[in-house]
């Protein structure tokens, strides 16, 4: 895994689609506070690209933008929280949340971490890199990912999912790299800031792996959890 944890099984993944839209809606609403026009709001533009890749219904996307921008007469008050700790078998985990009730979220996340270990700030983040992660697909048969990474200002690139390339950037460079990649034959599908592990835990048995995955799925299923990053090989 070694980065953002994702549901593996088809049935669970199908059930998670609604939760994915809910998480994206929160990100869109927060980004839209700075303006409802994606062309003038780079953060909103990147989240909208993620939403489109996830096949979020247009009506849902547009409502989230309007709500966040205050065009529907509703206030949006979410706070960002980050938790660090360990899943079973000392697998390092970083959990990002967006909540409208900090006390509720803190209490419920602590309960979920009882099968692992909730740590203090910095307890595992020292073993992760905070980076921009851009998924892009080639638009021409001769598009060269390594060359595009250098020319666009990315730190590195590696094969992504379904024929895409994952471009890695400094957090402050992500938007500029997104804008530059089309010049070098790559169309951006999604972009986000997140954590990548410097090292990963491996050698777990099937039974131990099942325990870790059950823990991660329970965390990811929480309504306030946006992203789960894990230092786990495989």
From Swiss-Prot:
Top-rank taxon = Bacteria
GO function term, MF aspect, one: DNA binding
Q: Identify the main location.
A: cytoplasm
Q: Where in the cell is it found?
A: Cytoplasm
Q: Which Pfam families match?
A: TACO1_YebC_N, Transcrip_reg
Alphabetized UniProt keyword annotations: Cytoplasm, DNA-binding, Transcription, Transcription regulation
Q: Name one GO biological process term.
A: regulation of DNA-templated transcription
- KW Magnesium (keyword) present: no
The family database entries (InterPro entries) matched by this protein are listed as:
Integrase-like_N (IPR017856), TACO1_YebC-like_2nd/3rd_dom (IPR048300), TACO1_YebC_N (IPR049083), Transcrip_reg_TACO1-like (IPR002876), Transcrip_reg_TACO1-like_dom3 (IPR026564), YebC-like (IPR029072)
An example GO CC term for this entry is: cytoplasm
Q: Which family does it belong to?
A: Belongs to the TACO1 family.
What is the official name of this protein in its record?
Answer: Probable transcriptional regulatory protein PSPTO_3162
- Which species does this protein come from? Pseudomonas syringae pv. tomato (strain ATCC BAA-871 / DC3000)
Lineage of origin: Bacteria, Pseudomonadati, Pseudomonadota, Gammaproteobacteria, Pseudomonadales
């Amino acid at each position: 895994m070694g980065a953002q944890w994702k549901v593996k099984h088809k049935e669970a993944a199908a059930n998670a689609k609604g939760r994915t839209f809910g998480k994206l809606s929160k990100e869109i609403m927060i980004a839209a506070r700075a303006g409802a026009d994606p062309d003038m709001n780079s953060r909103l533009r990147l989240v909208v690209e993620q939403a489109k890749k996830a096949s979020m219904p247009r009506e849902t996307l547009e409502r989230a933008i309007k709500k966040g921008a205050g065009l529907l007469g509703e206030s949006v008050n979410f706070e960002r929280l980050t938790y660090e700790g360990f899943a079973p078998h000392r697998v390092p985990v970083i959990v990002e949340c967006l909540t409208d009730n900090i006390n509720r979220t803190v209490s419920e996340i602590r309960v979920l971490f009882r099968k692992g270990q909730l740590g203090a700030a910095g307890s595992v983040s020292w073993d992760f890199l905070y980076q921009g992660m851009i998924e892009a697909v080639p638009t021409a048969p001769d598009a060269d990912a390594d060359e595009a990474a250098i020319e666009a200002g990315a730190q590195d690139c590696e094969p992504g999912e379904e024929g895409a390339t994952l471009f890695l950037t400094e957090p402050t460079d992500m938007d500029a790299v997104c804008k530059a990649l089309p010049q070098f034959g790559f169309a951006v599908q999604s972009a986000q800031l997140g954590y990548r592990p410097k090292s990963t835990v491996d050698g777990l048995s099937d039974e131990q792996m099942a325990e870790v995955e059950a823990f991660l799925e329970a965390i990811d299923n929480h309504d306030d959890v946006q992203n789960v990053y894990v230092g786990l090989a495989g």
